[in-house]
A protein has these predicted regions:
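Ubiquitin-like/PB1-type beta-grasp interaction modules and other compact soluble beta-rich domains
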Residues: 1-91
Length: 92
């Protein structure tokens, strides 16, 4: 299956703006992130507080829905999904 990934803000500085990735059936968001952090070394430090915990305020959307309200890192991926990666953003 093919999944389209879009990166925003500081995530774009360490990876391509958009990338298509292919997975076998049963892949999860955790699988996708492992592939991305393996390909783009600096992404792991920006995204994860611990190996199994995203940094606070990192937002990941699957087809426009925050994965926090789905199954988190265990959210199942499906063919054609669009995953958007947003780092913490602060303003003042």
């Amino acid at each position: 299956m093919k999944v389209h990934v879009k990166a925003f803000a500081t995530f774009r500085e360490v990876m391509d703006n958009q990338v298509d990735m292919e997975f076998t059936e049963g892949a999860t968001l955790r699988t996708l992130l492992a592939g991305l952090t393996g390909r783009y070394g600096g992404l792991n430090e920006l995204m994860f507080a611990t190996p199994d915990t995203l940094r606070d305020f990192v937002n990941i959307l699957k087809n426009g829905r925050n994965v926090h309200f789905l199954s988190g890192l265990d959210t199942q991926l499906e063919n054609g999904d669009v995953i958007a990666l947003f780092p913490p953003i602060a303003g003042g």
